[in-house]
């Protein structure tokens, strides 16, 4: 590429100014292969760069941003205006969307902005901190302009240098000092694992805190920890399964991603195991598992149930979080001896960490019961079920899946029976963030004024539970539950205390004479299914 670099240097004084592009006409020039790049009387248009790069087999982004100063998203929109408009509608930017998988809210528009959880609890009033992982810039208040395409952060998904990073407390702005021109030169249409995992692994405030099956290790892991993403295995990108929607008018990618986390937004069809591997009988033919998988035998087991025997196998995950303990001056901070992670934080309370967490089992038909701010944020009993999959044995669409169970406690109003949102960070949504004043009452007043929640002025801490889908850290076949000759493989599940049979429709382990019973109601405590 030395030839065009020499040509560019000859006209750099002209082309370094964005005005040279803006002044160009709509008609693109014609270039011959090997022709030195030079501007015409009206300057270079974006289309001129595309034409030149195509004729000379050059990377358009590297060429363009070698001579044009990257000035934010508006630089991307010079060529990608349609994509910018599409991105305004994506769940990664709006943090909500068509919620057809949330029971009773299938026709509504909900998502991360409304969901309650028992990690950092909720987004409202805390936008300035949460939006470190927002695919945009400046979302620090509910007044944020979601209609302005220049607010979209293109680089966070398309950077290929690995150097791009968002600052912790600046509402999604990049870390100071990054050479954004080099980042812009590197962009590619297809996000790599680091683009996706860089944000999703940090959900909940740290590496693998929330999901348990999505850690930064998966960026460059081995087949032992994930057969699909391992560099010595499938080496697959996230988008291989989390595919994008396509515009119905012209077929172009419209930035909607299937399989959004937290089962909140439907933006396309997610790849499932059988799309690539075929049905259970075919894939297991000729293996030791062939006799176990068939009509009448384990046909209601989802693939993940056996092929994810444990999560957090390399990087630990948080399994308990107690907000009631926050606000104390603890010194020294206790460190978990097994994981090396802190068990206390004055801002957040006390925690429990684990490696090699065995998922819990529940029937699921793909729908979820969720708690939503202002729509369904009340409770009657404890532990409050914040996220429970829909389905049971009598539901022909439901199968047994693995889930991560998270337990803890968090603020509630004992009088109005409301699961409360606390104002934790920043002062744009109120003057009394808990992480500044450590006064729960003031922080809850701030949030109630901001969200419209019903707060009587009295608070307590209620026990909560939530279940989260487990789909990553697929182990090699030889590590799957049931692998190995019978009866040894059978004992992976059919042994004492491994499975709570009552929640999946049995009086006891069928190998011990258990009988089939009616399905357990969806409201059953998730804790009853923990696999210890």
Language-model segments: residues:
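Sequence context of c-type cytochrome heme-c attachment sites
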Residues: 23-192, 198-270, 274-294, 402-407, ...
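Extended, compositionally biased alpha-helical segments that mediate assembly or anchoring
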Residues: 489-492
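Repeat-solenoid scaffold signature
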Residues: 269-382, 387-389
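Soluble extramembrane regions of membrane proteins in the secretory/endomembrane system
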Residues: 355-400, 404-450
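Bacterial N-terminal signal peptides that target proteins for export
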Residues: 1-9
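Bacterial N-terminal signal peptides
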Residues: 8-19
């Amino acid at each position: 590429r030395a030839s065009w670099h020499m040509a560019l240097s000859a006209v750099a004084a002209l082309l370094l100014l964005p005005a040279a592009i803006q002044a160009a006409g709509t008609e693109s020039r014609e270039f011959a292969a090997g022709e030195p790049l030079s501007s015409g009387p009206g300057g270079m248009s974006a289309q001129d760069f595309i034409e030149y790069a195509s004729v000379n087999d050059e990377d358009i982004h590297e060429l363009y941003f070698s001579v044009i100063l990257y000035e934010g998203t508006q630089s991307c929109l010079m060529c990608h205006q349609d994509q910018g408009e599409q991105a305004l509608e994506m769940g990664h930017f709006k943090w909500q969307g068509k919620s057809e998988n949330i029971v009773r809210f299938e026709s509504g528009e909900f998502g991360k902005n409304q969901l309650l959880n028992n990690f950092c609890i909720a987004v409202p009033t805390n936008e300035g901190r949460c939006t470190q992982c927002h695919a945009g810039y400046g979302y620090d208040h509910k007044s944020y302009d979601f209609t302005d395409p220049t607010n979209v952060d293109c680089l966070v998904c398309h950077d290929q240098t690995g150097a791009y990073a968002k600052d912790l407390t600046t509402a999604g702005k990049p870390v100071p000092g990054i050479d954004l021109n080099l980042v812009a030169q590197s962009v590619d249409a297809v996000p790599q694992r680091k683009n996706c995992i860089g944000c999703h692994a940090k959900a909940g405030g740290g590496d693998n805190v929330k999901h348990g099956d999505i850690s930064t290790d998966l960026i460059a892991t081995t087949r032992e920890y994930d057969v699909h993403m391992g560099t010595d295995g499938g080496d697959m990108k996230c988008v291989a399964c989390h595919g994008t929607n396509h515009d119905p008018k012209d077929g172009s990618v419209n930035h909607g991603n299937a399989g959004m986390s937290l089962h909140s937004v439907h933006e396309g069809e997610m790849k499932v195991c059988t799309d690539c591997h075929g049905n259970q009988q075919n894939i297991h033919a000729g293996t030791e598992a062939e006799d176990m998988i068939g009509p009448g035998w384990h046909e209601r087991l989802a693939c993940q149930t056996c092929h994810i025997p444990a999560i957090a196998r390399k990087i630990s995950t948080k399994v308990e979080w107690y907000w009631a303990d926050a606000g104390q001056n603890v010194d020294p901070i206790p460190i978990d001896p097994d994981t090396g992670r802190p068990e206390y934080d004055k801002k957040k309370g006390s925690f429990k960490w684990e490696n090699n967490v065995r998922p819990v089992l529940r029937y699921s038909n793909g729908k979820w019961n969720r708690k939503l701010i202002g729509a369904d944020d009340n409770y009657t009993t404890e532990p409050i079920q914040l996220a429970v999959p829909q389905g049971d044995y009598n539901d022909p669409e439901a199968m047994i899946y693995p889930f991560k169970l998270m337990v803890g406690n968090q603020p509630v109003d004992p009088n109005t029976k409301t699961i409360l949102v606390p104002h934790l960070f920043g002062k744009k949504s109120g003057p009394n963030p808990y992480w500044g004043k450590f006064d729960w009452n003031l922080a809850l007043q701030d949030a109630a004024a901001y969200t419209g929640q019903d707060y009587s002025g009295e608070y307590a801490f209620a026990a909560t539970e939530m279940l989260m889908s487990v789909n990553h850290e697929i182990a090699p076949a030889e590590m799957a539950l049931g692998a190995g000759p019978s009866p040894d493989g059978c004992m992976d599940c059919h042994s004492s205390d491994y499975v709570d049979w009552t929640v999946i429709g049995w009086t006891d382990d069928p190998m011990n004479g258990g009988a089939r019973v009616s399905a357990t109601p969806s409201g059953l405590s998730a804790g009853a299914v923990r696999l210890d």
